[in-house]
Amino acid sequence: MSPPALPSHHRAIVQANTDPVTFEISENRPVPVPLDDEILIKVSAVALNHCDYKMPGRVPCPGAVNGADYSGTVVRMGKKAELESGLRIGDHVAGAQVASSRRAPWAGAFAEYIRHHHSMVWKVPDGWSWEKAAAIGCATTSTVGMALWITLGLTGTPEEPAQEPEFVLVSGYRVVTTCSPKNFAMVESYGAEKAFDYHSSTCGEDIRAYTENRLQYVLDIITEARTIRQCYAAIGRGGGKYCGFELLPDDLLSTLRKSVKADWTMGLELTGNEVDLPGGYYRAANPEMHKWFVLWKQRYVALYDAGKLKPHPITVREGGLDKVIDGIETMRRREVSGEKIVYPLYNNSSKGVV
């Protein structure tokens, strides 16, 4: 397929030079040129993720492009990417960018065109909508898979029907979860055995009673003082493992049970590159993490295509990039619950399945 003509400039959402961090549209940015091992993607849809406001808030980088989850079409390829990726111009792909980066301020999904290393994207199966592909994004490509099978060290693999409460019902494991009561039916339909109200002051104790003091593994996607205490209260008398999604507060952990081994997961490590962030967020380069990701990526795409995994219910919002900033602010205000917000960037005449 002949490569399509490209504009010289495009639009992107970037961090504004404000405190606290806000976002703005950059109207006239040069279209990025892919390096030898990269592909250039024309973005068709983007999805919101909590990291879209959390990372800029922790590590401000004015002018850096924001956004993680996306889907789109390959429009240019570096020569190494042509040889190694198995992709071709015109293929439909999805992935999650490492955005709001001091080292790579051009990286970010909330743009009309993005460049991405070929190994970090996955080819979208036939028949998928742009919205579905974008909605899968960061949660499965990085943090959750890493949290379950690397940080928590679960045995077994997700071969059985595995649908999302905080990701999966894996083979041989019972899953309980927490959410708002309005979402109980949804998470139980996705595979959770039982859901508990995280607003309840006895949430942790209720889980511990339900699991008869035998709960061993806990994944905490919120990772605040309140949720950490709830998770520790839920783990059985014999102790277990706790995994958070944020840097853990040592002062709080020092007051909690020593029979629980606590750690946290940062999906940025799965690029294999150095994570050049300050303080406890720094990570040295780890190529083995990237090798694991490439294998995991192949597995989860197959599971999604077979219908054994699915994203949160998708809410499509119109307005393109101009409305994405409003969406980020709704997440920051915690007004989003039990849904994945997706914004199409294509025009209506091209709407349909991939």
From Swiss-Prot:
Superkingdom of the source species: Eukaryota
SUPFAM superfamilies, alphabetized = GroES-like, NAD(P)-binding Rossmann-fold domains
- Enzyme class, UniProt record, top EC level: oxidoreductase
In which pathway is this protein known to take part?
Mycotoxin biosynthesis
Give the EC number.
1.-.-.-
Cross-referenced InterPro entries, in alphabetical order? ADH-like_N (IPR013154), GroES-like_sf (IPR011032), NAD(P)-bd_dom_sf (IPR036291), PKS_ER (IPR020843), Trans-enoyl_RdTase-like (IPR047122)
Its assembly, as annotated, is: Monomer.
Name of the featured protein: Trans-enoyl reductase pydC
Q: Which organism is it from?
A: Acremonium sp
The gene for this chain is: pydC
